[in-house]
Amino acid sequence: MSGSASELVRWDAARLSEALRAGEVSAEEVTRAHLDRIDAVDGPTSGAGETGVHAFLHVDHEGALARARQIDADRAAGAELGPLAGVPIGVKDVLTTKGLPTTAGSRMLQGWVPPYDATVVRELHAAGLVVLGKTNMDEFAMGSTTEHSAYGVTRNPWDPTRIPGGSGGGSAAALAAFEAPLTIGSDTGGSIRQPAAVTGTVGVKPTYGAVSRYGLIALASSLDQAGPCARTVLDTALLHAVIAGHDPYDSTSIPAAVPDVVGAARLGATGDLAGVRVGVVRELSGEGYEPGVLARFEESLTELRAAGAEVVELSLPNIVHALAAYYLILPSEASSNLAKFDGMRYGLRVVPEGEHVTAEAVMRATRAAGFGDEAKRRIILGTYALSAGYYDAYYGSAQKVRTLVQRDFDAAFGSVDVLVSPTAPTVAYRLGEKLDDPLAMYAGDVATIPANLAGIPGMSLPCGLSEGLPVGLQVLAPQQADDRLYRVGAALEARLNDKWGGPLLAQVPTWQGASA
């Protein structure tokens, strides 16, 4: 074994992969190190008490170790294995996993164990990755803080009194706490990118349709997209290459070749962006953004120019209406998708007392007990927006705005290769700070939502600290040009790492139970 357990959990996936292929370390050793790390820092039983990260909802100790031993045996037998074989990974609890609980962070699916794997999970198994368990999330991906999970909040490893972002805060926090080198998230309006921003990690929302949604529990079907999360741009690219591709089980899947995202990341790591035109979105870098966030963003623009990129400012005039349109489209689609959860076939079932209990009574009792406040709020909003007499005024109008936003992006990409902005207007705020002000919470996704409306790919990567907390920079590219994200992201990462003297996450403070 070439590294101690405390060292192994800090290795990135690319380094782990090289060590595994060279026989310097076994998959079982790597997996056990990460399971021990989870046991040490993740929950009340870890010794970390109430300040545990709580990134995971379910940890599959036995299954992960058995899988790792099988990978080691296959490697010893000379079997041909994928580049990430033996590398551990966490999966957001919105993707179905055969034999493992899948709750989507809701009581409504409490105790449900799916009989099948999502296509993304199937691809992970085929590539030889070791699934450690399922990560925490806001209920049915409705939230920006992971405070709306029915199974407890997740804490930000940079400061356990602060949010890790959402809805996929568990996937991001697991990376920042060195509980896993890779995770899978899903992004409906920023649920991969916003948590990445506030935890100092990297997250990518691929082009809509580039990664299969089969087995992804739907929130808003025209917006949802699974994607890769990691601590480095290259690791994110390696995972992206595993999960992307056409899937006949998903009618929205794109039947097109996957861009060479790994090659783009390696090219970008040279730090050379000569000939690349970068657009700064005027509407996403001004009013409403914290001064520290804007300062780190401006410093990043300086680094992009130093790398040889041409940086120009441009306007997307209709993007200011994206947030309002999104919060009509999303609850409308969610109210339809969540109608299937009624306590009849799977998950929670609440039977009222009485001799003659009807199916309707069971549905009412189950949904009242099973859905949390935020889910109920959005179901009611969506049902209203779709109701007779209001459909055209609300949902129909929102879809027209969506088209205008898409056209703005099309026009912008006619003159630049990528667009950049801060990922989030603030750094991570205190747990509970915005629970009673949902509109303020929703505004945290103002920069990420437009990409979902347009179906374009987006990346968040760390660009510095403000008040000791991570700041994220967002890179956007045209549809099916996901490779551009990785070239620009890797170039900026390389320059910033040189400036900082190492990755930003090397500066994450230690706290109770979380030293590595």
Curated annotation (Swiss-Prot):
Q: Quote the catalytic activity from the record.
A: L-glutamyl-tRNA(Gln) + L-glutamine + ATP + H2O = L-glutaminyl-tRNA(Gln) + L-glutamate + ADP + phosphate + H(+)
Its biological purpose is as follows: Allows the formation of correctly charged Gln-tRNA(Gln) through the transamidation of misacylated Glu-tRNA(Gln) in organisms which lack glutaminyl-tRNA synthetase. The reaction takes place in the presence of glutamine and ATP through an activated gamma-phospho-Glu-tRNA(Gln).
User: One MF term in GO for this entry?
Assistant: glutaminyl-tRNA synthase (glutamine-hydrolyzing) activity
**Is this entry keyworded ATP-binding?**
yes
Naturally occurring in which organism (per UniProt): Kineococcus radiotolerans (strain ATCC BAA-149 / DSM 14245 / SRS30216)
**Name of protein:** Glutamyl-tRNA(Gln) amidotransferase subunit A
Q: Which family does it belong to?
A: Belongs to the amidase family. GatA subfamily.
Where do transmembrane segments lie in this chain? none
One GO cellular component term noted in the UniProt record for this chain = glutamyl-tRNA(Gln) amidotransferase complex
* Annotated GO biological process: translation
**What does the annotation say about its assembly with partners?**
Heterotrimer of A, B and C subunits.
Q: Where is the active site?
A: 92 (charge relay system), 167 (charge relay system), 191 (acyl-ester intermediate)
Show the HAMAP family listed in the entry.
GatA
Pfam family membership, one: Amidase
In terms of InterPro entries, this protein maps to: Amidase (IPR000120), Amidase_CS (IPR020556), Amidase_dom (IPR023631), AS_sf (IPR036928), GatA (IPR004412)
Q: Its Enzyme Commission number?
A: 6.3.5.7
The record's top EC class is: ligase
What keywords tag this UniProt record?
ATP-binding, Ligase, Nucleotide-binding, Protein biosynthesis
